[in-house]
Amino acid sequence: ETVSSGYVRFDHKFASDINLMAGLRMEHTSLRYTGRNYDDETDKTTKTGRMTNSYVNFLPSILVKWDVNDDFKIRGSYTQTLSRPKYSALVPSVNINRGDNEIKIGNSDLKPTISYNFDLSADYYFKSVGLVSAGFFYKKIDDFIVDQVLTNYEYQGTEYTRFTQPKNAGNANLWGLEFSYQRDFGFIAPALKYVGFYGTYTYTHSRVEDFNFEGRENESGLSLPGSPEHTANASLYFEKGGLNVRLSYNFASDFIDEMGPSTFYDRYYDAVNYMDVNASYTFGKKVKMTFYAEANNLLNQPLRYYQGTKDRTMQAEYYGVRMNAGLKISF
């Protein structure tokens, strides 16, 4: 894959409180690829023919910042972005597993995913360290890519129990709200200035349009695969001198991870709740030494997939708490 690009950019300041940045980026993508067909029964590979492709994209962007005053900022933007298919998805390869009667093939006809993005946010900065912000975003996504999984599917005269191929599955609209807050607690009492909190929350609503998935073309009401509806992060920290202690929490709701021939076969990545704690102490001037310790996954959150509904577990893996400690020396 060879990418050639160029851009123009224009910056302008209106009065003293409004800043504009506009630009246009052009990218030319050229592809040359070959693949290999693998058969596990014979343990042999055969090389496929060489294929080529190319496309050009023009990606505009406009960003505006309004400094309402020293503490309050409003930002708005429109951007167009590009996400190229993974190499492994593009390569015209065929992988046959005779034991399980499964086949995986690449798709050299995949188009890049284009996203049209609108963002609006407002930030307020406290007199002391910290800020509170709120934002709205909207994305129109064309030609998103998913792995299409079909069962009992015939390919080149042979029926396979499971057939997998990446494909452009349609378009999607996505909008959401995001909030963040960061501040130390010195405004409550001076003794608490070393203690602080940081948190974010994002709500995302997505709907798929023009669903191009064999056997499910007329389906509606689907969420965009890989897009959780709720995500949140929170961190409570203590920082004084060389001592740093932080307790962190992360949450993401469940989402579709893999599309099946019907909703019954859709694979979901289950909701996760992670909690970690880490601490470090740094001392020294010419030679700095840092003792650190951390413990991850305090809640023993499993890696879990389910099929269709939450009560149909496909896979669950528990890793327990992971701990690490050590010493760093820098000079």
Show which residues each predicted segment covers:
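Transmembrane beta-strands of outer-membrane beta-barrel pores
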Residues: 26-32, 78-84, 91-93, 138-142, ...
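C-terminal beta-signal and adjacent terminal beta-strands/loops
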Residues: 195, 251-259, 280-331
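Short loop/turn motifs that connect adjacent beta-strands in outer-membrane beta-barrel proteins
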Residues: 15-17, 71, 129, 186-195, ...
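Transmembrane beta-strands of outer-membrane beta-barrel proteins
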Residues: 20-24, 74-76, 132-134, 177, ...
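Gram-negative outer-membrane beta-barrel transporters
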Residues: 138-140, 158-256
